[in-house]
A protein has these predicted regions:
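Phosphoinositide-dependent membrane-docking surfaces
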Residues: 107, 116-133
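A membrane-cytosol interface segment of integral membrane proteins
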Residues: 132-174
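N-terminal membrane-targeting/pre-transmembrane regions
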Residues: 1-40, 44-47, 52
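Single-pass alpha-helical transmembrane signal-anchor segments
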Residues: 45, 66-75
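Generic beta-strand structural signal
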Residues: 101-102, 128, 137
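Short, surface-exposed beta-strand-loop junctions and turns on beta-sheet-rich folds
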Residues: 115-117, 124-126, 140-143, 151
């Protein structure tokens, strides 16, 4: 059985890849980062509340702490999009579009500049988002496949095929 995908690596795809990595192989690190961000926010809130309560004169520090807190909140809420933007800057010319063929022994990804072969043993985790399937190869490398472009079978058949070949469950991510 052979499955085929055509994927454009745009900001939406790269954001999905970042989300897939964050919720699979980076899960523990992501949790620690969010706990740290929460602690920073609590310290900032206490500091701001104390400066307001003491009625001290307006200083740059009084404005910088809330501004830093807003930045932490924004970065926490937009983490995947920010990582997607960084990844978009690092996409090599000619690799913005990829064709992939999944076969019995492995899968092959072709772009306008290269052709790469991968074995299923390299896959650490499989994540399924509403539009994409994400294969995590390491903490910093993933591949996304647009489910709308699937040919050669249904998404259910491909999900079962991947679970069989990798020995890993397909994790559903919203």
């Amino acid at each position: 059985m052979e499955f085929r995908f055509e994927t454009d690596y745009n900001l939406e795809t790269l954001t999905a890849m970042a989300k897939g990595l964050r919720q699979t192989v980076r899960k523990k690190r992501s949790r620690r980062t969010r706990i740290f961000a929460g602690i920073v926010l609590v310290i900032g809130l206490v500091s701001t509340a104390l400066s307001i309560a003491s009625k001290e004169p307006l200083r740059a520090r009084n404005l910088l702490v809330p501004l830093a807190m807003l930045n932490v909140i924004y970065a926490s809420l937009q983490e995947d999009r920010l990582n997607g933007r960084v990844a978009k800057r690092n996409v090599l010319p000619g690799t913005e579009h990829a064709s992939c063929v999944f076969g019995e022994d492995g899968y092959t990804i072709k772009t306008s500049v290269t052709e790469s072969k991968f074995s299923y043993a390299q896959i650490l985790a499989v994540a399924e988002l509403p539009r994409y399937l994400v294969l995590a190869l390491s903490n910093n490398q993933a591949q996304a496949f647009d489910k709308e472009s699937l040919s050669g079978g249904t998404i259910e058949e491909f999900r079962a095929f991947l679970a069989d070949k990798t020995g890993k469950p397909v994790q559903q991510i919203k």
